[in-house]
Structure formats: structure tokens, C-alpha cells
């Protein structure tokens, strides 16, 4: 559903339903079924040099199995906000800000895989922050087109789902708290070689530092 109460403001609402099932020939299979409801509300405001987008997504799941226990019903709101600013209308220069709350539900393998699965897993959660700049230009003397982007980001991840070694076998577990920071840079350009031939070039660079904050006594803390 799309609604525009003002020329600069657009509102939308979307609803999805998903059913997932796991079936195999192993006698230990619990034959789980997951019902998921996803509701998304979005708002977009654009006026002059400013564009702002906000969203709120609600996810609710319920699982049933023919054998054994299942995780508790789950629901979570995940907000996000992004802002783009173009200070000069005659220049394709944009400054960007973004915040996003995300999560990852345990998969059927994480929960029910024979001996490895753990039905008490919690969803993996992350808070993501990003600051970026984009610049592009057309019709230069050497380049038909050139584009440069630079982004810095910071992620805070908790309840990370990992395969954790135990005495006799591996086991899925919520283990870990990670802070990750990094920089992404890209460059793309188009150079005319002849009237009908263009050379397209692109490249990227990524630097990232991830810190494990799970155990202050561990060597990799």
C-alpha cells in the first residue's frame, strides 16, 4: 500500500507471509515447520537537498515440529534510518548517514541438525552504522564518466551463532560479541577509446578490523 500525504512525503506498508518446512528420510528428523510474518512500514521524505528514509520491520515466527521441542515464538521490531544530503544542486556530491538494526534467525540446520543442532539458540543481532560520501561527474575531457565512493562503518554483533566444539562433537551455540569497523572505497570510470568503443574501469579497496569481545581473558580479546 502506497500513500503520499504530501508532495515531499511518501508512506508505504507491506505485508508478507512465509512457510518453511524441513523434510528428509532420517528417522531422527523432527519435521519442523516455521510460519513467518513480516510487516514493513516505510517513510521517505525528499525536499531540495535532503532525502531521508525510515523503516520499521516487524518479524514474528512460530515453529511446530512432529517430534521434540521447538523454540519459543519470536517477534522483533527492526528499525532503520538513512539520510542523504546534496549540498549543491549542480554537483553530484552526496553525503550519507545510515543506521540499521538487523538480526538473523537460526536456520533449520542450526536448530535441528542431528547432534549438531541446538533448539535453544537465540537470534543473532547486529547494530550497523555507516557514514559515506559519493561523487560522480560526466563529460570530462578524459573521462565520459567517473564515480568515487568512500564509506566508513561500525558494526556491533551479539549472540553470534557459531559451531562450537564440545568433548565429542560440535554444537551450535550463541557465542560471541564482536565489534567491527572498516572503510570501503570504490572508483569507477569510463574512457572513450574510439567513437564506438568505451573502456570501463572499476576498482575497490576494503579495510576492516574486527575485535572479539566475548572473553576478556582470551588471547584474541
What does each model-found stretch correspond to?
Residues 88, 95-98, 104, 124-188:
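Membrane-embedded beta-barrel scaffold of Gram-negative outer-membrane proteins
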Residues 11-13, 50-54, 79, 93-97, ...:
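Transmembrane beta-strands of outer-membrane beta-barrel proteins
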Residues 7, 49, 147-156, 173-221:
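Gram-negative outer-membrane beta-barrel transporters
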Residues 17-23, 47-49, 56-64, 85, ...:
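Transmembrane beta-strands of outer-membrane beta-barrel pores
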Residues 4, 8-90:
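Signature of Gram-negative outer-membrane beta-barrel scaffolds
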Residues 3-10, 48-50, 87-93, 138-146, ...:
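Short loop/turn motifs that connect adjacent beta-strands in outer-membrane beta-barrel proteins
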Residues 26-33, 67-78, 105-125, 155-179, ...:
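Outer-membrane beta-barrel domain signature, especially the mid-to-C-terminal portions
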Residues 1, 35-41, 60, 77-81, ...:
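Hydrophobic, lipid-facing positions within transmembrane beta-strands of outer-membrane proteins
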Amino acid at each position: 500500500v502506497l500513500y503520499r500525504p504530501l508532495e515531499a512525503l511518501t508512506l508505504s506498508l507491506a505485508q508478507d507471509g512465509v512457510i518453511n518446512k524441513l523434510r528428509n528420510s532420517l528417522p531422527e528428523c523432527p519435521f519442523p515447520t516455521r510460519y513467518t510474518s513480516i510487516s514493513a512500514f516505510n517513510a521517505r521524505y525528499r525536499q531540495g537537498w535532503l532525502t531521508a528514509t525510515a523503516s520499521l520491520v516487524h518479524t514474528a515466527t512460530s515453529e511446530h515440529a512432529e517430534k521434540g521441542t521447538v523454540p519459543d515464538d519470536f517477534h522483533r521490531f527492526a528499525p532503520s534510518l538513512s539520510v542523504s544530503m546534496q549540498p549543491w544542486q549542480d554537483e553530484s556530491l552526496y553525503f550519507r548517514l545510515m543506521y540499521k538494526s538487523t538480526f538473523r534467525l537460526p536456520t533449520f540446520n542450526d536448530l535441528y541438525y542431528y547432534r549438531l543442532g541446538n533448539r535453544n539458540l537465540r537470534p543473532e543481532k547486529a547494530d550497523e552504522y555507516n557514514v559515506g560520501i559519493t561523487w560522480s561527474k560526466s563529460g570530462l575531457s578524459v573521462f565520459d564518466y567517473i564515480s568515487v565512493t568512500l564509506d566508513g562503518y561500525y558494526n556491533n554483533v551479539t549472540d553470534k551463532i557459531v559451531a562450537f566444539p564440545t568433548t565429542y562433537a560440535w554444537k551450535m551455540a550463541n557465542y560471541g560479541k564482536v565489534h567491527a569497523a572498516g572503510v570501503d572505497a570504490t572508483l569507477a570510470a569510463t574512457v572513450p577509446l574510439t567513437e564506438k568503443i568505451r573502456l570501463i574501469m572499476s576498482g575497490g579497496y576494503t579495510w576492516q578490523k574486527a575485535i572479539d569481545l566475548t572473553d576478556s581473558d582470551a588471547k584474541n580479546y
